[in-house]
């Protein structure tokens, strides 16, 4: 963040944000976040095998004292709470390592080993968490892993805690909700490259953390930069009420598909009266549609499952913990927390739909909807991650899609072309920029952005407009209560000033590729076909993978790649090889000579184009 565009309007906006927040004198969250602290690492830096730092616990040491002028005071408070790192006792037999990654790792003491809920994002941070637990509580092996849901910050560190050979031998169980593996790999396959680029904005990954950069991610301090892995589940949870005894510990499960993830579940420990609500009730409003991109979630289903959680466990839960943030203690406190959290999602859904049925569009709903004071005053319903504004548009999108029914929007111009025409119609870029400066001086930041954005989209080389727009993004980032809105504003500002940093093509981890079903990989090839390369050509190759007893025919005709399993009729060309060798050639770029008609396969692969990892966002 360069020198912040200062002035009375910014000061008033920040003061207004503080006044609108709940009671800053309410210190209950600080008690909950600090309760049960045991210890943390002596060395704050967690490194990979090559010495690269993948996580730095000292990166948040700046979060002391009052909020500076560059950070919303409410967000500063949330980041201070999330910055508490180390090993914490939750209740007898249950501990958490918090602050070692975006999510928490929960350790339950079994008869012989640890039952770990959610082994973080990276193998390195997961290993550091396990080492800390064993150092402070006594060394034990990991007896079981439990994945609460199918997002990588909850399973990517698996190999840091278990050896896959022990899993294959049956010495370690890996438990997950039904559909976990399918959704864990699918989310990052078809749209993975675009999601990865947008995630850089959401998490502010290219910016240094601090008062002028990312100030947490709203649900954690950030995402570790280590080795992402996947150890496949050995046991699926298929119904609510299913009970297991794992290493002597009774566990009961509630399936919650379609809430924060398409495959998700809560875990209840009846003998400890402890409930894990996964990512269904974090200390913030969550995303119904994540800005990085994903399928829209169902706010109504989310609320309904929290109602079910209250019915199943509300009168027998003394401790509540989640996959992010800090625990809650006391039956009445927990019941009220879950109920008000539920009510926030239900209100979001119902009122967005009511306004939609009154004819309002997504942006109009977002500009009108407000939580009732009884819900909005709770810190845990504030929009540190998801926001009411963004989520209300997601509800509209779920039911109505992108089209608002106005015929003027049936065939819109490209944004750059439309912007160029708007700028010309308004008298040229200098006049439009002057109007933008007037809007900013009047405190109308959003109109200033709308005007300056038109200039930049029309002409990315307009340096004064780029710098002005970057400055307004700095200002909006400083005001944002949402950590990820702040990150997106500040990343946009950086790219307006310095351009897009060259990226490397996103590649799935070896574990992820191994776990991906072959049909999904062939679908990935299909969305990479460039019709300019295949124009007027045709190709067909049979792929035979004896190690998996699979046979597919992949064909390109009419500039479309299609495939079929167990094809009939003779093949035009055939490649027979272990699937791992095919993956290495097709997706990793290895130069291997595959048995069979390798030339035909290479010709077909030549029609494909790798995704662009560094496409522009704030310019065109």
Language-model segment annotations:
Residues 163-217, 229, 258:
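Surface-exposed loop and adjacent secondary-structure segments within mature catalytic domains
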Residues 6-18:
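Hydrophobic helical h-region of N-terminal Sec-dependent signal peptides
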Residues 113-115, 121-123, 225, 229-235, ...:
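Metallo-beta-lactamase
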Residues 21-76, 192-223, 311-319, 326-519:
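Accessory terminal helices/loops
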Residues 93, 108, 118, 133, ...:
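Divalent metal-coordination and catalytic microenvironments
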Residues 80-140, 264-269, 273-279:
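Conserved beta-strand hairpin/beta-sheet module of binuclear metal-dependent hydrolase folds
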Residues 87, 112-113, 123-175:
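Active-site metal-binding motif and surrounding structural segment of the metallo-beta-lactamase
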Residues 435-438, 444-450, 454-457, 461, ...:
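Feature captures hydrophobic
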């Amino acid at each position: 963040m360069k020198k912040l565009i200062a002035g009375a309007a910014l000061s008033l906006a920040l003061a207004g944000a503080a006044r609108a927040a709940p009671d800053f004198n309410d210190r209950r969250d600080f008690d909950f976040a600090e309760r049960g602290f045991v210890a943390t690492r002596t060395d704050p830096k967690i490194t990979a095998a090559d010495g690269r730092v993948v996580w730095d616990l000292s990166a948040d040491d700046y979060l002391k004292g009052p909020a500076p002028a560059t950070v919303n005071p409410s967000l500063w408070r949330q980041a201070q709470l999330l910055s508490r790192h180390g090993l914490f006792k939750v209740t007898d037999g249950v501990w958490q390592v918090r602050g070692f990654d975006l999510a928490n790792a929960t350790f339950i003491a079994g008869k012989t080993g640890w039952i770990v809920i959610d082994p973080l994002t990276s193998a390195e941070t997961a290993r550091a968490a396990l080492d800390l637990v064993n150092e402070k509580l006594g060394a034990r092996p990991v007896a079981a892993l439990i994945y609460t849901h199918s997002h990588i910050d909850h399973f990517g560190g698996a190999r840091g805690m278990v050896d896959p050979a022990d899993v294959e031998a049956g010495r370690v169980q890996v438990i997950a909700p039904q559909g976990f593996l399918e959704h864990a790999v699918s989310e990052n396959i078809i749209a993975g490259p675009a999601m990865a680029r947008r995630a850089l904005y959401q998490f502010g990954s290219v910016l240094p953390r601090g008062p002028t950069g990312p100030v947490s991610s709203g649900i954690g301090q950030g995402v570790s930069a280590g080795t992402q892995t996947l150890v496949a589940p050995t046991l699926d949870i298929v119904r609510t009420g299913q009970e297991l005894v794992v290493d002597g510990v009774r566990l009961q499960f509630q399936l919650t598909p379609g809430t924060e993830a398409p495959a998700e579940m809560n875990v209840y420990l009846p003998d400890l009266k402890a409930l894990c609500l996964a990512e269904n009730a974090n200390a913030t409003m969550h995303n119904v549609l994540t800005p990085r991109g994903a399928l829209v979630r169902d706010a109504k289903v989310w609320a309904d499952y929290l109602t079910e959680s209250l019915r199943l466990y509300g009168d027998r839960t003394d401790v509540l913990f989640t996959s992010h943030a800090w625990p809650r203690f006391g039956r009445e406190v927990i019941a009220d927390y879950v109920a008000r959290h539920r009510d926030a999602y239900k209100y979001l859904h119902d009122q967005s739909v009511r306004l939609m049925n009154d004819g309002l569009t997504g942006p109009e709903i977002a500009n009108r909807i407000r939580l009732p004071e009884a819900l909005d005053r709770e810190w845990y319903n504030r929009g540190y991650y998801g926001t009411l504004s963004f989520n209300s548009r997601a509800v509209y999108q779920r039911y109505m899609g992108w089209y608002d029914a106005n015929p003027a929007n049936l065939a819109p111009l490209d944004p750059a072309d439309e912007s160029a025409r708007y700028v010309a119609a308004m008298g040229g870029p200098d006049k439009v920029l002057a109007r933008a400066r007037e809007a900013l001086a009047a405190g109308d930041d959003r109109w200033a952005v709308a005007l300056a954005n038109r200039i930049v989209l029309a002409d990315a080389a307009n340096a004064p407009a780029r710098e002005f727009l970057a400055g307004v993004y700095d200002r909006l980032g400083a005001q944002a209560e949402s950590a990820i809105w702040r990150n997106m504003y500040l990343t946009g500002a950086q790219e307006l000033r310095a351009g897009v940093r060259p990226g490397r093509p996103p590649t799935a981890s070896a574990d992820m590729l191994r776990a991906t079903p072959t049909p999904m990989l062939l679908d990935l090839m299909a969305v990479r076909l460039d019709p300019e390369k295949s124009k007027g050509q045709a190709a067909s190759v049979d792929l035979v993978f004896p190690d998996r007893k699979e046979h597919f025919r992949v064909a390109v005709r009419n500039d479309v790649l299609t495939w079929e399993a167990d094809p009939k009729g003779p093949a035009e060309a055939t490649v027979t090889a272990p699937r791992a060798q095919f993956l290495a050639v097709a997706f990793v770029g290895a130069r291997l000579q595959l048995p069979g008609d390798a030339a035909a396969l290479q010709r077909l692969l030549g029609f494909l184009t790798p995704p662009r990892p560094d496409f522009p966002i704030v310019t065109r």
